[in-house]
Design a protein with these regions (language model features):
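Short, contiguous strand/loop micro-motifs
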Residues: 5-7, 33, 165, 182-183, ...
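GST-like fold's C-terminal all-alpha helical module
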Residues: 107, 111-201
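Acidic/histidine-enriched, glycine/proline-rich intrinsically disordered or flexible terminal extensions
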Residues: 212-229
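Short, hydrophobic secondary-structure boundary micro-motifs
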Residues: 87-92, 115-117, 159-164, 206-211
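Active-site-flanking alpha-helical
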Residues: 81, 177-178, 209
Length: 229
């Protein structure tokens, strides 16, 4: 079984980060195929992604043995759980697993205000933007409040250090949120801060951050708050 994961720029692509971090941290075998974001109609990025995914978005997981592709980060996670049932993609306890899926679906489908006003940008340091957004955007405050409540509930039930004890898809899905809190210096509780620090030190997350900082790329479409690096 030879799996290839197509991803976008590590500095910006929060959806790519999720399955990559999960697979790397759990030791699942895969080959990374990184494509530089370029959203022009006939760009190499669009052509390469369209060749394997009708959705035209990253991430995409391809089984190179037969070319079968799975797209969308949550669909990829479920495919990995089926392929590697003992790897720990989801918590082993049925109730914990159901709760993990519930909060992952929340982040997958919701929190649009946080995503829109504070897009992932690992390399940037934007505390002034974060302070302004937090003060002016009530929906961002509500998004962050709900995220912190979900974290606190999971950590209280599991005892930590990850949301459900051991690292799982839930932590992989919230890793980009942790990056946003750090980039924009968003105010969070001490419990959330400890969790964010632990996620940041997770080997797979640390490796992703290192790669993101090394990209030295500037994608205008992903930079609503800066004119240059």
């Amino acid at each position: 079984m030879a799996l290839q994961l197509l991803i976008g720029n590590k500095n910006y692509s929060s959806w790519s980060m999720r399955p990559w971090v999960l697979m790397k941290q759990l030791g699942l075998p895969f080959e990374e195929h990184k494509l530089r974001f370029d959203f022009a109609p006939d760009s190499p990025f669009r052509r390469a992604v369209a060749a394997v995914s009708p959705a035209g978005c990253v991430p995409v997981l391809v089984d190179t043995a037969d070319g079968f592709a799975v797209w969308d980060s949550l669909a990829i996670v479920e495919a990995l759980h089926e392929r590697f049932p003992a790897a720990g993609v989801w918590p082993s306890d049925p109730q914990a697993r159901a709760r993990a899926r519930s909060i992952v679906c929340e982040i997958h489908a919701g929190f649009g205000a946080l995503r829109s006003h504070c897009p992932m940008n690992i390399e940037a340091q934007l505390p002034e933007v974060g302070a302004r957004v937090f003060a002016e955007q009530a929906e961002v405050r509500l998004n962050l409040q709900r995220i912190e409540a979900a974290w606190a509930d999971a950590l209280r039930s599991s005892g930590g250090p990850y949301l459900f004890g051991a690292f799982s898809a839930a932590d992989a899905f919230f890793a980009p949120v942790c990056m946003r809190v750090l980039t924009y210096a968003l105010p969070v509780s001490d419990t959330s801060r400890r969790y964010i620090d632990h996620v940041k030190r997770t080997p797979a997350v640390a490796a992703w951050i290192t790669d993101a900082l090394a990209e030295a790329d500037f994608i205008v479409e992903d930079e609503p708050h800066r004119q240059q690096r």
